[in-house]
Amino acid sequence: MVFSKISQVAHYTPKQVISNDDLSQIMDTSHEWISSRTGIEKRHISTVEMTSDLAIRVAEQLLAGSGYDATALDFIIVATISPDASMPSTAAKVQAAIGATNAFAFDMTAACSGFVFALAMADKLIASGAYQRGLVIGAETLSKIIDWQDRSTAVLFGDGAGGVLLEASEQQHFLAEALHTDGAQGQSLTSGQSSLRSPFSQGQEVNSFLQMDGRAIFDFAIRDVSRSITAIIEQSGLAKEELDYLLLHQANRRILDKMAKKIGMPREKFLENMMHYGNTSAASIPILLSESVQNGQLKLDGSQHILLSGFGGGLTWGSLIVKI
């Protein structure tokens, strides 16, 4: 039987850093207001790079770390809600840029759950026996879809990318998964809405900026996501104590605080870096994963159990328990 494992991690963020104090110069806010409510202190904002540029940098790092030539890749999946364009896909641009001529490539649109959804799909591709290895990348330039006059959203988001190289393994590393969607709550978090613009349409103009009902999303995360995480831990057969770390979508520190209490696990097991990057949607979990390997908290030697959990627009939420 064929399984898959995460063998490389990488991340990349734009050089431009915007602090809370910087934002206070262009809108009615302050460092204290943002930090106390979200835990965010700064974020990286792209000035010239597109989403594909960030994803390409991650792909190049993953290949360099692995020693593989790009032609050894079988697939590339990019999770994003801020692609360069509707087509070609961001993944197709990555494929062309790195010369992965044997890989099929496509984008995954599942908002802040996108990386988890894409990773679950990639695991199944390799487990089928038809494919040996591929890249799963979360990449966003959310700065281009934000209304910078709306402080309820503008202070939250940042740009960045992270990803993993997934390849075949004789040992099982993906131990449990749970993926969910509730489209009935979809209007709680929206972006990129398009008007009907044909000569025959009677469509109304719509707001295409990212819009969010913050209270609804907070309640959804604490209620539905915590319930799903508790269920997947039970599904895995692991005791809570056997989980080394939980890497949740980096939306808000208060969500992590509440989640730890709701699930009944030590807060220190919930890794975080939103203070440095803000909410980077599909990129938040792989950036956190890569940084945690970089700083030595995670080893990639098969000795640790981690839980990855994303939640956001759709509404979508999903969790994986992985041995790394």
From Swiss-Prot:
Entry's EC annotation: 2.3.1.180
Protein name: Beta-ketoacyl-[acyl-carrier-protein] synthase III
Pathway(s) where this gene product acts: Lipid metabolism; fatty acid biosynthesis
Keyword field: Acyltransferase, Cytoplasm, Fatty acid biosynthesis, Fatty acid metabolism, Lipid biosynthesis, Lipid metabolism, Multifunctional enzyme, Transferase
Domains as described in the record: The last Arg residue of the ACP-binding site is essential for the weak association between ACP/AcpP and FabH.
Native organism: Streptococcus equi subsp. equi (strain 4047)
UniProt-listed GO biological process terms: fatty acid biosynthetic process
Molecular function via GO: 3-oxoacyl-[acyl-carrier-protein] synthase activity; beta-ketoacyl-acyl-carrier-protein synthase III activity
Description of how the protein assembles with itself and partners: Homodimer.
Keyword Cell inner membrane on entry: no
Subcellular location(s) per record: Cytoplasm
Enzyme class: transferase
Active site per database record: C112, H249, N279
Role of this protein: Catalyzes the condensation reaction of fatty acid synthesis by the addition to an acyl acceptor of two carbons from malonyl-ACP. Catalyzes the first condensation reaction which initiates fatty acid synthesis and may therefore play a role in governing the total rate of fatty acid production. Possesses both acetoacetyl-ACP synthase and acetyl transacylase activities. Its substrate specificity determines the biosynthesis of branched-chain and/or straight-chain of fatty acids.
ACP-binding: annotated span: 250-254
Pfam family of the protein (one): ACP_syn_III
Cellular component aspect of the GO annotation: cytoplasm
Main location: cytoplasm
